[in-house]
Curated annotation (Swiss-Prot):
Record bears the keyword Disulfide bond: no
GO cellular component: apoplast; plastid
Gene designation: BGAL6
UniProt protein name: Beta-galactosidase 6
EC id: 3.2.1.23
Enzyme's top EC category: hydrolase
Amino acid sequence: MEMGRLVFGLCLILIVGTFLEFSGGATAAKGVTYDGRSLIIDGQRKLLFSGSIHYPRSTPEMWPSLIKKTKEGGIDVIQTYVFWNLHEPKLGQYDFSGRNDLVKFIKEIRSQGLYVCLRIGPFIEAEWNYGGLPFWLRDVPGMVYRTDNEPFKFHMQKFTAKIVDLMKSEGLYASQGGPIILSQIENEYANVEGAFHEKGASYIKWAGQMAVGLKTGVPWIMCKSPDAPDPVINTCNGMKCGETFPGPNSPNKPKMWTEDWTSFFQVYGKEPYIRSAEDIAFHAALFVAKNGSYINYYMYHGGTNFGRTSSSYFITGYYDQAPLDEYGLLRQPKYGHLKELHAAIKSSANPLLQGKQTILSLGPMQQAYVFEDANNGCVAFLVNNDAKASQIQFRNNAYSLSPKSIGILQNCKNLIYETAKVNVKMNTRVTTPVQVFNVPDNWNLFRETIPAFPGTSLKTNALLEHTNLTKDKTDYLWYTSSFKLDSPCTNPSIYTESSGHVVHVFVNNALAGSGHGSRDIRVVKLQAPVSLINGQNNISILSGMVGLPDSGAYMERRSYGLTKVQISCGGTKPIDLSRSQWGYSVGLLGEKVRLYQWKNLNRVKWSMNKAGLIKNRPLAWYKTTFDGPNGDGPVGLHMSSMGKGEIWVNGESIGRYWVSFLTPAGQPSQSIYHIPRAFLKPSGNLLVVFEEEGGDPLGISLNTISVVGSSQAQSQFS
């Protein structure tokens, strides 16, 4: 009986779902308020499903398709952060071009009839470099981030007002008839508030009042901030907000979930986190059953951390396990199963938003959440929390529910959806090589010069902090020194400690060893044998970062780089060079001359491949050219033959790669790196790779990316 009802109900939903609207389209929004049940847009309650898409993690050419697929998945709102360090890379100098064109992104959302939740922050975390804060903030005198600190509050308010004024000037707030129905100030402040003591509480109160004072005409939210001041709405982030969120801090605020994690971030050396479609659907349905009226999937499309935008140790692909993968392809059954959930819930929006809730116990681990109204009908959520299937009696009918599942009863009778029953077929992503770069004569090589102490312009008698010198303009800083050996040294070795992410140690121009940390190991310790000569010996150590941190209290106090250098001779006491004279060189020559651009290729002397010498060279720049693949589908570079570095295509960085950092299963965390079609020309594309460790460019391949199996959200009920 239940299966017949399920088939009938889903058929009906999928037929009428396209035409179902609660109270008008996004482009007609004139005002947004709220009460304890939901947001109210143009005087009508809204039950909203939202999906996070971050505009700089894809290209403007991708935005229309991503938004279209998101809308077709039953999503009403697109939620995005605003990226301060992209928009104000230098104090007072703003950039809203290309992937940074926030206005264009929002207007595209509006053109497709969806709403926007604009998370201004401007601290955002987001696994983004420095949590979105521009690095120049650290050099402002007296600066302490995210607390009751006047320098920080000044710059935070200035940027927040800049974004609000930009949105107003384009008429993009709902109060102006635009699509923006919500704005967010700050981000997950509960994680750090205790570290600032009473200044944390006063800061969050100030932040809320400052935001409200900007008069956007739409509500402000704070995620993971239980003490959000009125009228700011505090919201939940997590995987199980239906179980963990006690609700907003006022009965007059709606229950909202701003981050329902569809997967989880991934760092180098770790496997991807796989969250099932069934689990996401269960907790989303439970949140609605418990009076939730806004759910945002974080991420709905993750995209790519182009350039150096990822935070410490995070891979370049972002939330690839989302309903729309890194390339914007449907990930089934996650996409389709959630689409059916949205349709099922929206079919009963009226009783959900207008009806009275009743909670019934139907067994030791079974409940019913019933919403009923004489004028608006009835809907019930039957919840089975048991690890085994359960037969549930409800209103004189029997329903069989799978383990850990929620069934949705339209009209409190017809079982139209069950979270644990997936009707959408799984698809599989396929990579197809279209070109292997295995012709040696097609590659050219340029090797970085290893600097020596005498040639450096900055010298001190101490090991300086890495980012104080680089200002986050580059990942790299050379530490150079020299010492004289007057007596024989048996079994010589060098020992280094670093709070940076990577070190490459050269002694007398020979690589002695390399080491790196991880998200879990914060201090890099390296002991390596070396060859020394009588007389003067040169030490050159390349310190590397893999992104700045994205979270935590007192981020402005974090320090990185070398902290100890010692030379040992057999069993004798080590020679501590930490307080010797050190010289510094910021960045790489190839970076300084922008060797990845066509116009700068002749600024260095490239070598042709000779007898295989192009392989396994540390600190090497490689270049070649290639033609773009036919078609318009996604494209990626397979980099499994390389080690660690960065990739540019026609001058655009597609991100860092680190395929030598293996997971416990012995595989790279990421092997294929996305090249957006917008970066490509039909022919004559320039590929430049900087390799830190040593790899074989002859093993790199160009691939097209596609899916086989279910490419649309179709099921046996459609």
